[in-house]
């Protein structure tokens, strides 16, 4: 009986962290208590965060939230691109691509390999953001469409 309660607490805890919307331990405590785990307190949540290796990172809305390491999976060349690219935005002269953490350099390398023939002058990549500079004279909207098609294809 105790193991079943502990297992259900662990499952609820992991489910909450997968939502990537809890920025503080007290928010996690409140959510668990609302789910019926009334005995949970901040120190218990702190121990669980440590036990499962949870970290605080930015979600897609740029909020600092707790998440589990398996949700921060490191991208590799086998990862579908559409799962790694979160957003593509632009102004008149520059394209900004937001990716999952750690994926920007992988995707920038792909874009660089496509190169000038497709209208890409160059890229600069950080951990989760890529700046794409189009070649002179190219319609930026056409380039964005081509980039989005590239992400949709299963490479």
Curated annotation (Swiss-Prot):
Q: Which UniProt keywords apply?
A: Amino-acid biosynthesis, Arginine biosynthesis, Cytoplasm, DNA-binding, Repressor, Transcription, Transcription regulation
The keyword Repressor is assigned to this record = yes
Grouped into one coarse class, the protein's main location is cytoplasm
Tell me the Pfam families matching this sequence.
Answer: Arg_repressor, Arg_repressor_C
- Which molecular function GO terms apply here? arginine binding; DNA binding; DNA-binding transcription factor activity
InterPro entries with a match to the protein in the record: Arg_repress, Arg_repress_C, Arg_repress_C_sf, Arg_repress_DNA-bd, WH-like_DNA-bd_sf, WH_DNA-bd_sf
PANTHER family per record: ARGININE REPRESSOR
**NCBIfam families to which the protein is assigned, alphabetical:** argR_whole, PRK05066.1
Q: What is this protein called?
A: Arginine repressor
Q: What is the lineage of its organism?
A: Bacteria, Pseudomonadati, Pseudomonadota, Gammaproteobacteria, Pasteurellales
**Which gene is annotated as encoding this protein in its UniProt record?**
argR
């Amino acid at each position: 009986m105790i193991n079943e309660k502990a297992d259900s607490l662990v499952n609820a805890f992991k489910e909450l962290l997968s939502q990537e919307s809890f920025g503080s331990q007290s928010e996690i405590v409140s959510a668990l208590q609302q789910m019926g785990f009334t005995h949970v307190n901040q120190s218990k949540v702190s121990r669980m965060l440590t036990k499962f290796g949870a970290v605080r990172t930015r979600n897609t809305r740029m909020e600092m939230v707790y998440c589990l390491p398996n949700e921060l999976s490191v991208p590799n060349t086998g990862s579908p691109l559409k799962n790694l690219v979160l957003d593509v935005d632009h102004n008149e002269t520059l394209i900004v691509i937001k990716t999952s953490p750690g994926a920007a350099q992988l995707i920038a390398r792909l874009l660089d390999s496509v190169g000038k023939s497709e209208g890409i002058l160059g890229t600069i990549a950080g951990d989760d953001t890529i700046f794409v500079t189009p070649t002179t004279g190219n319609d930026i909207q056409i380039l964005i469409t081509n980039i989005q098609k590239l992400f949709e294809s299963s490479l």
